C-alpha cells in the first residue's frame, strides 16, 4: 500500500509558528512519525510539502499515475478557498483524508469552512500530529492496497 501525505503552506514551519496552536514539534518530527508508522505497518508513505498551490495540484495529479492508493492532505489555508485543489482531489478516485492539526472549528470564522473536505473521504481535525496517524489507520482499515 502506498499513501501520499501532502502538506500545504506553512506546515514546514511547524515548531516555529504559533506553537500554542500547532505545538512545539517541528516538521522533521512529523516526517519521523510518518516514517515510523510506515515501518510498523509495512506500507509505503510518500511525503510532499509545498507552499505553492500549483505544485500541490501537480502532485495530486501525479498520484493518478504513480500507483498511489490513498492521499492524506493538510491543505493549510488553501482548505478555505482553493477550488483548484478541490477539483484536483475530486479528479482522483482513491480515498482521501483531510487532516488539520488544530481544531479549525474553534478558531477564526473563516477557518470553519473547508472547500476541499466535501471531495474527501473524511476529515480529522484538532488532534495534533496524531491526526496523521489516525488517517493512516483509517486508510489501512479500508483494505484498498
Swiss-Prot record:
Active-site residues from the entry: 22 (proton acceptor), 100 (proton donor)
CDD domains, per database record: DHQase_II
Sites annotated Transition state stabilizer: 17
UniProtKB keywords: Amino-acid biosynthesis, Aromatic amino acid biosynthesis, Lyase
Substrates-to-products reaction catalysed: 3-dehydroquinate = 3-dehydroshikimate + H2O
GO molecular function (one): 3-dehydroquinate dehydratase activity
Pathway the protein acts in: Metabolic intermediate biosynthesis; chorismate biosynthesis; chorismate from D-erythrose 4-phosphate and phosphoenolpyruvate: step 3/7
Pfam families xrefs: DHquinase_II
Residues that hold substrate according to the record: 74, 80, 87, 101-102, 111
Listed GO biological process terms: amino acid biosynthetic process; aromatic amino acid family biosynthetic process; chorismate biosynthetic process; quinate catabolic process
Gene3D superfamilies: Dehydroquinase, class II
Enzyme nomenclature, EC number: 4.2.1.10
Subunit structure: Homododecamer.
Protein task: Catalyzes a trans-dehydration via an enolate intermediate.
Family: Belongs to the type-II 3-dehydroquinase family.
Name the UniProt record assigns to this protein: 3-dehydroquinate dehydratase
Record organism: Lachnoclostridium phytofermentans (strain ATCC 700394 / DSM 18823 / ISDg)
Protein encoded by which gene: aroQ
